């Protein structure tokens, strides 16, 4: 066994190169999925509004995402994350071609972690507002608005799904990049 030259090291042959390329392709796919999640969330939230007449057509209540600063933060944060992910796509393609690139992958991990923090903060803040919109808070005399603005609440709830999905994909991206770096 000692003369065979194998001492528990992984082979750097064609199989290892194929696995590295597969990880890079998976990285690209995850980035595209994260772009879709963050962009769809930002668009869904940013285009959400509902008008409800109050007694007559002349007196109306209008609810928009921009009425709540937390939801504005949600749109901006998801837009920033989406822009970053779009900008990172060419670098991810470079990793498919040159899977041995190390420093660019470190840079991507750093910014992926920053975007994960941003999307997590936005999704969490948005979830808190959506919870209040659905349930209200009796002790603070905040009434649930989703009984009146049901379309508005459905859209903002739906936009949270894309953002939380993007969070999961960003976590997978970070883990995938760490595995790819560990294989070097």
Curated annotation (Swiss-Prot):
Glycosylated residues, chain numbering: 49, 137
InterPro entries reported for this sequence: CASP/CASPL, CASP_dom, CASPL
Sequence ranges on the Extracellular membrane side: 44-72, 127-159
An individual GO BP term: cell wall organization
Bilayer topology term: Multi-pass membrane protein
Nucleotide-binding is among the record's keywords: no
GO-annotated cellular components: plasma membrane
Membrane-spanning ranges: 23-43, 73-93, 106-126, 160-180
Membrane-side (Cytoplasmic) residue stretches: 1-22, 94-105, 181-184
Main location group: membrane
Intracellular or extracellular location(s): Cell membrane
Pfam families in UniProt: CASP_dom
UniProt keyword terms in alphabetical order: Cell membrane, Cell wall biogenesis/degradation, Glycoprotein, Membrane, Transmembrane, Transmembrane helix
Assembly: Homodimer and heterodimers.
Family membership noted in the UniProt record: Belongs to the Casparian strip membrane proteins (CASP) family.
Its job: Regulates membrane-cell wall junctions and localized cell wall deposition. Required for establishment of the Casparian strip membrane domain (CSD) and the subsequent formation of Casparian strips, a cell wall modification of the root endodermis that determines an apoplastic barrier between the intraorganismal apoplasm and the extraorganismal apoplasm and prevents lateral diffusion.
Protein name per the record: Casparian strip membrane protein 3
Originating organism: Brachypodium distachyon
């Amino acid at each position: 066994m000692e003369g065979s030259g194998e001492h528990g090291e992984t082979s750097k042959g064609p199989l290892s190169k194929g696995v590295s390329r597969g990880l890079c392709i998976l990285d690209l796919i995850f980035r595209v999925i994260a772009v879709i999640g963050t962009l769809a969330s930002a668009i869904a939230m940013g285009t959400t509004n509902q008008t409800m007449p109050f007694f007559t057509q002349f007196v109306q209540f209008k609810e928009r995402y921009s009425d709540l600063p937390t939801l504005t933060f949600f749109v901006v944060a998801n837009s920033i994350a989406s822009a970053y992910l779009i900008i990172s796509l060419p670098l991810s393609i470079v990793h498919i071609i040159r899977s041995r690139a190390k420093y660019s992958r470190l840079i991507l991990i750093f910014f992926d972690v920053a975007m994960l923090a941003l999307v997590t903060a936005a999704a969490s803040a948005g979830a808190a507002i959506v919870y209040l919109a659905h349930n209200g808070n009796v002790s603070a005399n905040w009434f649930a608005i989703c009984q009146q603005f049901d379309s508005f609440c459905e859209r903002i709830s739906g936009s949270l799904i894309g953002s939380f999905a993007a969070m999961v994909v960003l976590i997978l991206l970070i883990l995938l990049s760490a595995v790819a770096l560990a294989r070097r």
